[in-house]
Amino acid sequence: MNEFPVVLVINCGSSSIKFSVLNASDCEVLMSGIADGINSENAFLSVNGGEPAPLAHHSYEGALKAIAFELEKRNLNDNVALIGHRIAHGGSIFTESAIITDEVIDNIRRVSPLAPLHNYANLSGIESAQQLFPGVTQVAVFDTSFHQTMAPEAYLYGLPWKYYEELGVRRYGFHGTSHRYVSQRAHSLLNLAEDDSGLVVAHLGNGASICAVRNGQSVDTSMGMTPLEGLMMGTRSGDVDFGAMSWVASQTNQSLGDLERVVNKESGLLGISGLSSDLRVLEKAWHEGHERAQLAIKTFVHRIARHIAGHAASLHRLDGIIFTGGIGENSSLIRRLVMEHLAVLGVEIDTEMNNRSNSFGERIVSSENARVICAVIPTNEEKMIALDAIHLGKVNAPAEFA
């Protein structure tokens, strides 16, 4: 093992690679960055928030070579002891993170039709990393695996059985790495025993989902076979009546592909407001009296509150509601509106704590009189991926997650 081992965390998206390098001893981030515009002439690399530098080679392999060169410039290349990959979809095959072997790669490829935009990019990242870092243990961490503890009644759709049996049509859930990290931190913050606890975690960002966590395990979540189901999001519709879309198709002669683009790219906050998918823009418009921005936010909040309350029904007891993700951590307005909707559950807001900036870190934002504790816990998916790699790679883990 290296004297100063580090973990390289790689998240290959459909056109980007986000990466970070963490000290294996305490998971402190040593460097991070993004390569974006992959497979286009505009491909660039930005390290530690610096100026974007054009990439000479636009492929995933070319981008990872450029990332490896940045590590080399900082004398970190030879210290890479482990590599953790975020994998979008593990299907029902992967119930936990796994050391990457030929068999694991084959199984990732088998389930890749469930998430073609992301899984094939993930595989490109794995193959390139194997060439650049030969002999380094690599670990796959799946966005879906945390939710594989859901019971059949939570993951089945009310469709003919053959679609589940023959095609694997069922609810898988996403954001699992975030929900797992945040629920683990919540046990510490709220002083709960992991084997006797009930939490609802709201991961709110441009993509958003709710997860019910009972005794440390996911028992229900709002996203489904794809990330489209559940909450209204930045550009995704969330739950929508299939009959409504069928009627739209008949009236507009749009194809299934057209409608898929509409519900994924043109709906949600953007669709209702007609203004933006960025909540920061909509909050500014909210305060300026923009009616459709206000309506978009109210609809967003209504869906969040309804799903939080519904997911609580999957718990034996509701100990806490946790906000995380870019919006959940940073928008005091959204948290306030959601908590006001949840007064029926005994939620009461502590206005002063709710209004504190996210730099304050983990914090309880409900009042002392509340029957249900509400808290903000910043997510850290990179750290969770690194911790899984450390655990599977047999490196000493930081005490908080050992």
From Swiss-Prot:
One of its GO terms (biological process) is L-threonine catabolic process to propionate. Keywords: ATP-binding, Kinase, Magnesium, Metal-binding, Nucleotide-binding, Transferase. One of its GO terms (cellular component) is cytosol. The record marks H175, R236 as: Transition state stabilizer. Pathway: Amino-acid degradation; L-threonine degradation via propanoate pathway; propanoate from L-threonine: step 4/4. The active site is at D143. It comes from the Bacteria. InterPro entries: Ac/propionate_kinase, Aliphatic_acid_kin_short-chain, Aliphatic_acid_kinase_CS, ATPase_NBD, Propionate_kinase. Gene3D superfamilies: 3.30.420.40. ATP binds at residues 11, 18, 175, 203-207, 278-280, 326-330. It catalyses: propanoate + ATP = propanoyl phosphate + ADP. Substrate binds at R86. Its cofactor is Mg(2+). Pfam families: Acetate_kinase. One of its GO terms (molecular function) is propionate kinase activity. Its EC number is 2.7.2.15. Mg(2+) binds at N11. Catalyzes the conversion of propionyl phosphate and ADP to propionate and ATP. Homodimer. PANTHER family: ACETATE KINASE (PTHR21060), PROPIONATE KINASE (PTHR21060:SF17). Belongs to the acetokinase family. TdcD subfamily. This is Propionate kinase. It comes from Escherichia coli O6:H1 (strain CFT073 / ATCC 700928 / UPEC).
